[in-house]
């Protein structure tokens, strides 16, 4: 599903490969409910990431929220429209229109196809995200951490 996009984003922010995952779902029969899950990601460089993917919340709350904690600083991105910084010298808030980067991504892809050059996303990263996604389903079934190989 859509969780792979968030795994990919976390991997980009961590600048590392996922080495283990643990996924837990809500409900009495969680194996059949992947619309309400928490995914824990462990990275090769020691970074941890948590993805909470819930379809049972209020529609009035932001649909997508990213929080990054590092070196006594926090960045919070709400719906790709508002970015707030805490403990970031000289920065507190930025707002704008929603931009998930699709237009720029396709412009860069078109440029690469016409002129050549490196892939926008390294193949190894795509493979790691795919393996991590499959490992999430395995983790849900096993109710345990699963290594990503």
Spell out what each predicted region is:
Residues 44, 111-149:
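C-terminal helix-rich "cap/oligomerization" subdomain common to oxidoreductases
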Residues 91-100:
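A short glycine-threonine-serine/GTX helix/turn-capping micro-motif
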Residues 1, 100, 124-127:
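A generic "alpha-helical surface" signal
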Residues 50, 94-95, 119-122:
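A short, structure-level motif marking secondary-structure boundaries and short turns
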Residues 1, 5-82, 103-117, 148:
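Contiguous beta-strand/loop segments that form the cofactor/metal-binding neighborhood of enzyme cores
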């Amino acid at each position: 599903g859509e969780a792979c996009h968030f795994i990919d984003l976390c991997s980009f922010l961590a600048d590392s490969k996922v080495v283990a995952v643990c996924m837990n779902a809500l409900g009495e029969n969680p194996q059949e409910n992947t619309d309400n899950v928490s995914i824990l990601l462990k990275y090769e460089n020691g970074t941890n990431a948590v993805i909470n993917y819930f379809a049972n919340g209020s529609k009035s709350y932001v649909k997508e929220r990213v929080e990054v904690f590092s070196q006594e600083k926090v960045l919070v991105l709400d719906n790709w429209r508002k970015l707030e910084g805490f403990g970031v010298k000289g920065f507190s808030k930025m707002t704008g229109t929603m931009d998930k980067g699709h237009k720029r991504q396709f412009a860069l892809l078109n440029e690469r196809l016409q002129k050549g050059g490196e892939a926008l996303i390294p193949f190894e990263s795509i493979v790691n995200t795919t393996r991590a996604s499959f490992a999430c389903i395995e983790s849900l079934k096993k109710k345990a951490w699963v290594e990503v190989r």
